[in-house]
Amino acid sequence: SPVPVWLPILAWVWTAGIAVLLLYTAVSTLRLRYKVREAVRLQGNVYQSERIGSPFVLGTLRPKIYLPYRIDIRDRQHVIAHEQAHLRRGDHLWKPLGFLLLTLHWFNPVMWLSYVLLCRDIELACDEAVIKELGCEQRADYMQALVSCSVNRRKIAACPLAFGEIGVKERVRSVMNYKKPTFWIILVAVIACI
């Protein structure tokens, strides 16, 4: 049977959508790399730059943490802990993978929602990883770092993982209401998995 006339048109539209998203990602990443090209090493894989307004992780094979020079010294340890949590969890790999899947299925609204939820859950998981090690006073400092970093975040780029990226109100609420899981909750969860 002959190929419907509209099928090649849909294929071109799908390919164009992919091209637009990949171009956006490439341009965003190149612009970010240009901004941090003169960043100064602070410690290990942590760099500071006066040309950025918000902390983030950049890179997949050799990821680096970038901090703005303007960051408050009290906020810095919390920001670094948060960004290191991203690296320990492999978020610098998971988020680009999620974006790649979104790119292939850009026409599907469920994929857009899934990507937004992935980004939110990544941030919440890193917040939880950091705050479970903190006392009440330090949690307040962490919330302050979260708010001050989000104020300086102008736009969300496709690949970098940025501290204070999304849902700050929800993240602050989550930090305030955090309780370590009890032994019984953990036991029930383990049994449910088995």
Say what each PLM segment does.
Residues 1-194:
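Membrane-embedded and juxtamembrane structural elements of multi-pass membrane proteins
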